[in-house]
Amino acid sequence: MAKEGKRIRAAREGIEATKLYALDEAIKLVKERATAKFDETVEVSMNLGVDPRHADQMVRGVCNLPNGSGRTVRVAVFARGAKADDARAAGADIVGAEDLLEIVQGGKIEFDRCIATPDMMPLVGRLGKVLGPRGLMPNPKVGTVTMDVKGAVAGAKGGSVEFRVEKAGIVHAGVGKVSFDADKLVENIKAFADAVAKAKPAGAKGTYVQRIAVTSTMGPGVKVEPNTVLTA
Protein backbone atom coordinates (compact mmCIF):
# COMPACT_ATOMS: atom_id res chain seq x y z
CA MET A 1 0.00 0.00 0.00
CA ALA A 2 2.87 2.37 0.79
CA LYS A 3 4.30 1.72 -2.67
CA GLU A 4 0.93 2.49 -4.27
CA GLY A 5 0.60 5.67 -2.24
CA LYS A 6 4.05 6.77 -3.35
CA ARG A 7 3.17 6.10 -7.00
CA ILE A 8 -0.03 8.12 -6.75
CA ARG A 9 1.75 11.01 -5.05
CA ALA A 10 4.40 10.99 -7.75
CA ALA A 11 1.74 11.00 -10.47
CA ARG A 12 0.06 14.03 -8.90
CA GLU A 13 3.28 16.04 -8.91
CA GLY A 14 3.14 18.86 -11.41
CA ILE A 15 -0.68 18.94 -11.43
CA GLU A 16 -2.20 21.96 -9.70
CA ALA A 17 -5.32 20.80 -7.86
CA THR A 18 -7.26 24.03 -8.40
CA LYS A 19 -6.09 24.90 -11.91
CA LEU A 20 -8.30 24.46 -14.96
CA TYR A 21 -6.12 23.20 -17.81
CA ALA A 22 -6.74 23.56 -21.52
CA LEU A 23 -7.92 20.22 -22.91
CA ASP A 24 -4.79 19.52 -24.95
CA GLU A 25 -2.59 20.27 -21.93
CA ALA A 26 -4.74 18.07 -19.69
CA ILE A 27 -4.45 15.17 -22.14
CA LYS A 28 -0.67 15.59 -22.19
CA LEU A 29 -0.56 15.39 -18.39
CA VAL A 30 -2.80 12.30 -18.33
CA LYS A 31 -0.72 10.48 -20.95
CA GLU A 32 2.56 11.32 -19.18
CA ARG A 33 1.27 9.95 -15.89
CA ALA A 34 -0.22 6.70 -17.20
CA THR A 35 2.46 4.30 -15.97
CA ALA A 36 0.48 1.07 -15.53
CA LYS A 37 1.63 -2.06 -17.35
CA PHE A 38 -1.51 -2.10 -19.50
CA ASP A 39 -3.08 0.30 -21.96
CA GLU A 40 -5.12 2.44 -19.60
CA THR A 41 -8.51 3.84 -20.56
CA VAL A 42 -8.85 7.62 -20.73
CA GLU A 43 -12.08 8.76 -19.10
CA VAL A 44 -13.88 12.10 -19.11
CA SER A 45 -16.33 13.11 -16.40
CA MET A 46 -18.71 16.06 -16.53
CA ASN A 47 -20.56 17.59 -13.58
CA LEU A 48 -23.89 18.89 -14.82
CA GLY A 49 -26.32 21.38 -13.33
CA VAL A 50 -29.19 18.90 -13.20
CA ASP A 51 -31.04 16.87 -10.59
CA PRO A 52 -31.81 13.51 -12.25
CA ARG A 53 -34.39 12.75 -9.56
CA HIS A 54 -36.67 14.96 -11.66
CA ALA A 55 -37.85 13.43 -14.93
CA ASP A 56 -37.38 16.70 -16.83
CA GLN A 57 -33.71 16.84 -15.81
CA MET A 58 -32.63 13.37 -16.95
CA VAL A 59 -29.67 13.31 -19.34
CA ARG A 60 -28.98 10.28 -21.51
CA GLY A 61 -27.91 9.57 -25.04
CA VAL A 62 -25.31 8.01 -27.27
CA CYS A 63 -22.15 9.39 -28.85
CA ASN A 64 -20.24 8.01 -31.81
CA LEU A 65 -16.58 8.59 -31.00
CA PRO A 66 -14.83 9.64 -34.23
CA ASN A 67 -11.72 7.62 -33.38
CA GLY A 68 -13.34 4.68 -31.61
CA SER A 69 -13.02 3.71 -27.96
CA GLY A 70 -10.13 1.28 -28.23
CA ARG A 71 -12.02 -1.43 -26.39
CA THR A 72 -13.58 -4.65 -27.60
CA VAL A 73 -17.36 -4.40 -27.20
CA ARG A 74 -19.38 -7.61 -26.99
CA VAL A 75 -22.85 -7.15 -28.45
CA ALA A 76 -26.01 -9.19 -27.87
CA VAL A 77 -29.01 -8.81 -30.16
CA PHE A 78 -32.59 -9.95 -29.59
CA ALA A 79 -34.01 -10.54 -33.06
CA ARG A 80 -35.61 -13.15 -35.30
CA GLY A 81 -35.41 -14.11 -38.95
CA ALA A 82 -33.80 -11.69 -41.38
CA LYS A 83 -32.96 -9.20 -38.64
CA ALA A 84 -31.12 -11.90 -36.72
CA ASP A 85 -29.17 -12.66 -39.90
CA ASP A 86 -28.36 -8.95 -40.26
CA ALA A 87 -27.06 -8.86 -36.69
CA ARG A 88 -24.79 -11.84 -37.25
CA ALA A 89 -23.52 -10.37 -40.52
CA ALA A 90 -22.68 -7.12 -38.72
CA GLY A 91 -20.58 -8.99 -36.15
CA ALA A 92 -22.91 -9.41 -33.16
CA ASP A 93 -21.45 -11.81 -30.60
CA ILE A 94 -24.75 -13.32 -29.42
CA VAL A 95 -28.03 -13.38 -31.34
CA GLY A 96 -31.27 -15.00 -30.27
CA ALA A 97 -34.81 -14.73 -28.93
CA GLU A 98 -36.30 -17.08 -26.33
CA ASP A 99 -33.01 -18.98 -26.23
CA LEU A 100 -31.11 -15.79 -25.41
CA LEU A 101 -33.74 -14.91 -22.81
CA GLU A 102 -33.06 -18.21 -21.02
CA ILE A 103 -29.30 -17.61 -21.12
CA VAL A 104 -29.66 -14.18 -19.52
CA GLN A 105 -32.20 -15.39 -16.96
CA GLY A 106 -29.67 -18.05 -16.02
CA GLY A 107 -27.22 -15.33 -15.05
CA LYS A 108 -24.90 -15.65 -18.02
CA ILE A 109 -24.38 -12.07 -19.21
CA GLU A 110 -21.34 -12.08 -21.45
CA PHE A 111 -21.96 -8.86 -23.36
CA ASP A 112 -21.43 -5.12 -22.97
CA ARG A 113 -24.26 -3.81 -25.16
CA CYS A 114 -27.74 -5.17 -25.77
CA ILE A 115 -29.79 -4.36 -28.88
CA ALA A 116 -33.33 -5.44 -29.74
CA THR A 117 -35.82 -5.02 -32.56
CA PRO A 118 -39.08 -3.35 -31.42
CA ASP A 119 -41.10 -6.56 -31.75
CA MET A 120 -38.77 -8.27 -29.27
CA MET A 121 -39.33 -5.78 -26.44
CA PRO A 122 -42.24 -7.67 -24.80
CA LEU A 123 -39.79 -10.56 -24.44
CA VAL A 124 -36.82 -8.41 -23.42
CA GLY A 125 -39.04 -6.56 -20.93
CA ARG A 126 -39.03 -9.67 -18.75
CA LEU A 127 -35.32 -9.06 -18.20
CA GLY A 128 -35.72 -5.56 -16.79
CA LYS A 129 -34.57 -6.52 -13.29
CA VAL A 130 -31.48 -8.21 -14.72
CA LEU A 131 -30.45 -5.84 -17.49
CA GLY A 132 -31.68 -2.56 -15.99
CA PRO A 133 -29.28 -2.32 -13.02
CA ARG A 134 -26.38 -3.13 -15.37
CA GLY A 135 -27.30 -0.38 -17.81
CA LEU A 136 -27.93 -2.96 -20.52
CA MET A 137 -31.67 -2.58 -21.09
CA PRO A 138 -32.35 -1.68 -24.75
CA ASN A 139 -33.81 1.81 -25.13
CA PRO A 140 -35.01 3.62 -28.27
CA LYS A 141 -33.59 6.92 -26.93
CA VAL A 142 -30.05 5.61 -27.34
CA GLY A 143 -30.69 3.64 -30.51
CA THR A 144 -30.62 0.16 -29.01
CA VAL A 145 -34.27 -0.57 -29.85
CA THR A 146 -34.26 -0.40 -33.62
CA MET A 147 -35.00 -2.17 -36.88
CA ASP A 148 -31.57 -1.11 -38.12
CA VAL A 149 -29.75 -3.80 -36.17
CA LYS A 150 -26.91 -3.83 -38.67
CA GLY A 151 -26.23 -0.13 -38.07
CA ALA A 152 -26.64 -0.46 -34.30
CA VAL A 153 -24.20 -3.36 -34.09
CA ALA A 154 -21.70 -1.56 -36.32
CA GLY A 155 -21.99 1.55 -34.15
CA ALA A 156 -21.48 -0.37 -30.91
CA LYS A 157 -18.50 -2.22 -32.35
CA GLY A 158 -17.09 0.94 -33.91
CA GLY A 159 -16.93 3.06 -30.78
CA SER A 160 -20.34 4.44 -29.89
CA VAL A 161 -20.73 5.03 -26.15
CA GLU A 162 -23.94 5.38 -24.19
CA PHE A 163 -24.17 7.87 -21.36
CA ARG A 164 -26.62 8.49 -18.55
CA VAL A 165 -26.36 11.02 -15.75
CA GLU A 166 -25.87 9.57 -12.27
CA LYS A 167 -27.56 10.66 -9.03
CA ALA A 168 -24.89 13.26 -8.25
CA GLY A 169 -25.36 14.92 -11.64
CA ILE A 170 -22.24 13.35 -13.14
CA VAL A 171 -21.94 11.79 -16.58
CA HIS A 172 -18.78 9.97 -17.64
CA ALA A 173 -17.40 7.68 -20.31
CA GLY A 174 -14.26 5.98 -21.53
CA VAL A 175 -13.15 7.89 -24.62
CA GLY A 176 -10.05 6.01 -25.75
CA LYS A 177 -6.76 4.55 -24.59
CA VAL A 178 -3.58 6.31 -23.45
CA SER A 179 -1.89 4.79 -26.51
CA PHE A 180 -4.10 6.98 -28.74
CA ASP A 181 -2.52 10.06 -30.27
CA ALA A 182 -3.34 13.14 -28.19
CA ASP A 183 -5.26 14.79 -31.03
CA LYS A 184 -7.49 11.73 -31.40
CA LEU A 185 -8.31 11.80 -27.68
CA VAL A 186 -9.10 15.51 -27.95
CA GLU A 187 -11.46 14.82 -30.87
CA ASN A 188 -13.21 12.03 -28.97
CA ILE A 189 -13.64 14.12 -25.82
CA LYS A 190 -15.03 17.07 -27.77
CA ALA A 191 -17.47 14.77 -29.58
CA PHE A 192 -18.63 13.31 -26.26
CA ALA A 193 -19.00 16.74 -24.63
CA ASP A 194 -20.99 17.99 -27.62
CA ALA A 195 -23.32 14.98 -27.39
CA VAL A 196 -23.90 15.67 -23.69
CA ALA A 197 -24.49 19.37 -24.43
CA LYS A 198 -27.08 18.50 -27.09
CA ALA A 199 -28.83 16.22 -24.59
CA LYS A 200 -29.48 19.17 -22.25
CA PRO A 201 -32.94 18.59 -20.75
CA ALA A 202 -35.70 21.17 -20.73
CA GLY A 203 -35.72 21.31 -16.94
CA ALA A 204 -32.03 22.24 -16.57
CA LYS A 205 -31.52 25.62 -14.93
CA GLY A 206 -28.41 27.77 -14.54
CA THR A 207 -25.03 26.60 -15.81
CA TYR A 208 -25.46 23.22 -17.48
CA VAL A 209 -21.83 22.03 -17.79
CA GLN A 210 -20.22 22.99 -14.47
CA ARG A 211 -16.99 21.00 -14.31
CA ILE A 212 -15.01 18.69 -16.59
CA ALA A 213 -12.11 16.41 -15.69
CA VAL A 214 -10.05 13.78 -17.48
CA THR A 215 -8.15 10.87 -16.02
CA SER A 216 -6.71 7.47 -16.89
CA THR A 217 -7.58 4.16 -15.23
CA MET A 218 -4.79 4.35 -12.65
CA GLY A 219 -3.88 8.01 -12.92
CA PRO A 220 -4.86 11.25 -11.18
CA GLY A 221 -7.68 13.46 -12.39
CA VAL A 222 -6.95 16.69 -14.23
CA LYS A 223 -9.49 19.52 -14.20
CA VAL A 224 -10.27 21.03 -17.59
CA GLU A 225 -11.43 24.49 -18.65
CA PRO A 226 -14.89 23.78 -20.17
CA ASN A 227 -14.50 26.45 -22.86
CA THR A 228 -11.62 24.44 -24.36
CA VAL A 229 -13.85 21.37 -24.67
CA LEU A 230 -17.27 22.60 -25.75
CA THR A 231 -17.44 23.64 -29.38
CA ALA A 232 -20.78 25.41 -29.15
From Swiss-Prot:
InterPro entries assigned: Ribosom_uL1_bac-type (IPR005878), Ribosomal_uL1 (IPR002143), Ribosomal_uL1-like (IPR023674), Ribosomal_uL1/biogenesis (IPR028364), Ribosomal_uL1_3-a/b-sand (IPR016095), Ribosomal_uL1_CS (IPR023673)
One GO cellular component term noted in the UniProt record for this chain: cytosolic large ribosomal subunit
Gene Ontology biological process terms, A to Z: regulation of translation; translation
PROSITE patterns xref list: RIBOSOMAL_L1
S-S pairs: none
Highest taxon, organism lineage: Bacteria
Molecular function GO labels: rRNA binding; structural constituent of ribosome; tRNA binding
Signal sequence region: none
Subunit details: Part of the 50S ribosomal subunit.
Biological role: Binds directly to 23S rRNA. The L1 stalk is quite mobile in the ribosome, and is involved in E site tRNA release. Protein L1 is also a translational repressor protein, it controls the translation of the L11 operon by binding to its mRNA.
HAMAP family named among the record's database cross-references: Ribosomal_uL1_B
Protein name, per record: Large ribosomal subunit protein uL1
Organism, scientific name: Methylobacterium radiotolerans (strain ATCC 27329 / DSM 1819 / JCM 2831 / NBRC 15690 / NCIMB 10815 / 0-1)
